[in-house]
Regions:
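N-terminal auxiliary segments of SAM/dcSAM-dependent transferases
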Residues: 1-93
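Conserved SAM-binding loop of SAM-dependent methyltransferases across substrates and taxa
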Residues: 140-151
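A short SAM/SAH-binding and catalytic strip from SAM-dependent methyltransferases
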Residues: 198-212
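Conserved catalytic loop of SAM-dependent methyltransferase domains
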Residues: 275-304
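Short alpha-helix
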Residues: 257-273
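Conserved class I S-adenosyl-L-methionine
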Residues: 131-139
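A short glycine-rich, Lys/Arg-flanked "PGG" loop and its adjoining helix->strand segment in the class I
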Residues: 213-228
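Short, glycine-/aromatic-enriched active-site segment of Class I SAM-dependent methyltransferases
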Residues: 235-256
Length: 330
């Protein structure tokens, strides 16, 4: 067995205390090896730099936290020099893509205003009170904190990008809540037919999958009977037989495979075994929701759209539209 990466030891200890379900306990035995491979400095050459940034976070105590505000917030007293140290350490984890966050007055203005998406979906989903929740492709965990703020008993986010895991750890360092986790895993690394979660979220993942039906069935297998799937993905206009396959890039992304119409997406979900399928929202992404900032200085949505017509991508395809669909496991 490989050694557990130091930043993930507390997660395993928390699972050991809480998990009684047989399938989860079996998964727990696999985690040290999974985490060691996912957080390998041999595979990810920037990991030492990111870990140094995490280690440089100053010691501060939050007197108030807010998981329900637009920005996940921790407040408390801090000297000016300490705040400079805090900001320097956090900027060492650039680029910050999903948020926003506010730590002791240091505002992390992320590329995405992820609160916009939460505001669109939260009124339409099953209440999260006392639920075990999975967030697939969670990034740095912004929505995981919102799920906890909505009353979830336990939230597990998974994302294979080590930087996002360490960004989450930076926020967790000050929020100090041990029932929210971001693990360095892809959905395919979870045990098959886990059937352990009351609600599973998959947002911004499906269009990156070469086999969308396989992704939907993998999501289905994470859910306990009666559990709810909350799915968000790129869509195009059309009927239930409309699916757009970008010939090359889409909005400068080379890893976009299938963009269904909402009706086609719901047809796929029925094929994958879901019931009670509801279209919650369709929204064209705006440059107010996704843009470059001081905390994410690379290209963003304004660079991916036709400068003369924001209804088209630079390649001439329909501009990004995102649908939110809920469904249930019988």
């Amino acid at each position: 067995m490989l050694d557990t990466p130091p930043e993930l030891i507390a997660d395993i200890e928390a699972f050991q205390r809480r998990w009684e379900d047989r399938a989860l306990r079996d998964w727990l035995q696999q985690m040290p090896d999974q985490f060691s491979l996912s957080m390998s400095e041999t595979r990810f050459g920037d990991l030492p730099r990111w870990r140094a940034a995490l280690a440089a976070l100053p010691s501060l105590k939050a007197e108030m936290i807010d998981l329900d505000a637009s920005a996940i917030t921790a407040l408390g007293p801090a000297a000016e020099q300490v705040l400079l140290e805090l900001e320097t350490a956090l900027r060492g984890l650039h680029p910050w893509r999903k948020g926003p966050f506010s730590l002791f007055g240091v505002d992390i203005d992320t590329e995405w205003r992820s609160d916009f998406k939460w505001d669109r979906l939260s009124p339409a989903i099953d209440p999260l009170e006392d639920r075990r929740v999975l967030d697939v492709g969670c990034g740095s965990g912004y929505h995981c904190w919102r799920m906890k703020g909505a009353g979830a008993r336990e939230v597990i986010g998974i994302d294979p990008t080590p930087l996002f895991v360490l960004q989450f750890k930076a926020i967790q360092h000050y929020l100090n809540i041990d029932s929210v986790h971001v693990l360095p895993l892809a959905l395919e690394q979870l045990p098959p037919k886990l059937k352990a979660f009351d609600t599973t979220f998959s947002m911004g993942v499906l269009y990156h999958r070469r086999s969308p039906i396989d992704h939907l069935t993998d999501l289905r297998d994470t859910l306990a009977p009666g559990g709810q799937l909350v799915l968000e993905t790129l869509v195009v206009e059309g009927d239930e037989d409309t699916v757009f396959v970008p010939p090359e890039r889409y909005a400068r992304m080379g890893n976009v495979w299938f963009l269904p119409s909402p009706a086609a997406l719901m047809k796929w979900m029925r094929k994958a075994g879901f019931t009670d399928i509801q279209l919650v929202d369709v929204n064209q992404t705006t440059v107010a929701e996704q843009r470059s900032t001081d905390w994410m200085t690379f290209y963003s949505l304004p660079n991916f759209l036709d400068s003369a017509d924001h209804n088209k991508t630079v390649e001439g395809h329909p501009a990004p539209r995102r649908a939110i669909v809920t469904a249930r496991l019988p």
